[in-house]
Amino acid sequence: MVVSYPNHERNYCVFDVNKINKLTSKREGALPIIEEKLLSAKNEDDIIENLYAINLLLDNGIDKNKISELYPTLAKFNDSKSPNIQTYLAGIYRKTKIPDAFGPLVKMLIQDSINPPKNSHFDPTEEIGGAILDYLA
C-alpha cells in the first residue's frame, strides 16, 4: 500500500498499518532503520511514512533524546513546502522541543502565512503554530 493522502473527506494520511507496526515494534532499534530510509528517501511517501513512525514512537514513550539525535537528518526536510512533511516535522519538534528546530518552525509559519499551501485539505500552520507555542510555554 502506498500512502493515502488527505482528501475532502479526511484531513490526515493513511499508512500501511502492518508495515508501520512492524517497524515501530523495534522501538529504539527502529531509529537507525528510519534514519537510513529518510536519508535515501526518493519521494514524499517515503518521507512522511518515516516521520509518522517517529511520531508513533514518541507517542509510545520512546526517549525524546534518542529522537533528538536524528535532528541532522530531520533538518534535511525543514525547507519543504509540503504541508504533510511540515505537519509531521512540527509534531516531532513539538514533542521533542529540539532547540535547533525552533527557527525552522518560525520560518515554516511565516512562509505558509505569506504563501499558503495550495490544494491542501488541512492547514499545516495549526500544527506549526502549536509547536511554536509549546516551545514558548
Regions picked out by a protein language model, each given a short descriptive name:
Residues 10-26, 36, 45-64, 76, ...:
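Structural detector for internal amphipathic alpha-helices that build alpha-solenoid repeat scaffolds
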Residues 1-5, 25-39, 61-77, 98-116:
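Amphipathic alpha-helical scaffolding segments comprising HEAT/armadillo-like alpha-solenoid repeats
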